């Protein structure tokens, strides 16, 4: 079955204190999500540590991402993408707090052996 959508048109109608996750595709070994962030910060010392590789595109907005072991945050702007290997510990240190929100497209997939 053919499925369609629009990341920007289908955004939540208001700002949220937490991130809003929408799964667009979920197949064995592959998950694609739209993530909407407004003022999202992962506290110091807490990290995402995922079993899958994650390719992330910043569709709209702006964000800062910290990779464990790096001394500086990475500033991400619209159109920037990053590939995070499985178990690459990372955290979001800042996203915009005003409208439009920060919109991410995240593709999670099984790492190569």
PLM regions: where:
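A short, N-terminal "cap"/entry segment at the start of jelly-roll beta-barrel domains
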Residues: 1-47
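Short, charged/polar surface micro-motifs in flexible loops or helix N-caps
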Residues: 28-30, 38-42, 60-64, 88, ...
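Ligand-binding loop in jelly-roll beta-barrel domains
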Residues: 77, 86-113
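Short, acidic/polar N-cap/turn motifs at the starts of alpha helices
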Residues: 20-22, 62, 79, 89
């Amino acid at each position: 079955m053919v499925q369609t959508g629009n990341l920007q048109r289908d955004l939540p109608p208001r700002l949220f204190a937490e991130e809003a996750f929408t799964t667009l595709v979920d197949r064995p070994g592959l998950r694609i999500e739209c993530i909407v962030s407004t003022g999202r910060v992962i506290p110091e010392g807490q990290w995402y540590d995922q079993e899958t590789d994650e390719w992330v595109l910043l569709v709209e907005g702006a964000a800062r991402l910290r990779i464990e072991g790096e001394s500086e945050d990475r500033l991400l702007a619209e159109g920037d993408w990053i590939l995070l290997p499985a178990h690459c510990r990372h955290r979001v240190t800042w996203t915009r707090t005003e409208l439009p929100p920060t919109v991410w497209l995240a593709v999670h997939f099984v790492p190569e052996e």
